[in-house]
Amino acid sequence: MRRVIAHTIAIFLLTAGVSVSAAQQPAPEGLSRPASAAEVAASLAGSVAWIWPDSNGPLHQGKAAGPPYREAAVLVESLVLRAGRVERGGRTQPLALPAGVRVVPVVHVEAAADAPDSFTPAQRSAILAAVRRHAGRAAAGLLQLDFEAPPRQREAYRALVAAAREALPAGVRLSVTVLAHWCTQGDWLDQLNVDEVVPMLYRLGPHAEDWRRRFERGDSRLARRCRGPALGFATNDPPSRMLLARAARPYWFDEAAWSNPSRPAGHLIP
């Protein structure tokens, strides 16, 4: 019996060693290279472009047929939460979209340093009113809440997401953007009542490559919802070809407003 157990343990350890070794193997050289401009454009043609208020969206490149992107995640309203009040902003210029491009309205929320840990009733009502107001523009059947809530507002954020889900009509799904490190903070993201979680894999700081490798291989320590089909990338800092291939539903951000600005870029919070 002891021999059987010892043999079984040996096989398990050997198998585990092979698995760990395989997980730690670097990607083949061709797949580890950053995606080229042509590969980014090809991905964008079948995916989603984030369009912020200072942009008119991606332009056609060359003689490509069809629209340069499939869906436009357009920031339609922004709300800055401050101590006891809400500041509203949003798009001030008209947006002309190519024929056939469907809109995903994005409600963007920011918390200033003096914002309370728990939202005031007026702040909560303002966010939910924006969600209801723009749900009718969701031609893609999806509305996105873009809110990088600080840790002190985590519980308020979870309650807000649940309320936003309730505020949407039955035919409109809810998407949320998340910071990459949120995906390593337990399973709280898996418990959100949302239809889509979009980890933003750009502006990752000095450990950017480590983060991207974790998403490349679908690290089991990442929250399950962070290993879904949607991933957020930036055109100026493209992912590896392997990571791009993993994203069945890429979202693309462009630091230069797609070189098609509608007004000077500006930040909501100085």
Model regions: which residues?
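Secreted glycan hydrolases and related glycan-binding modules that recognize and/or cleave
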Residues: 2, 18-270
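Bacterial N-terminal signal peptides
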Residues: 8-17
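Bacterial N-terminal signal peptides that target proteins for export
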Residues: 1-9
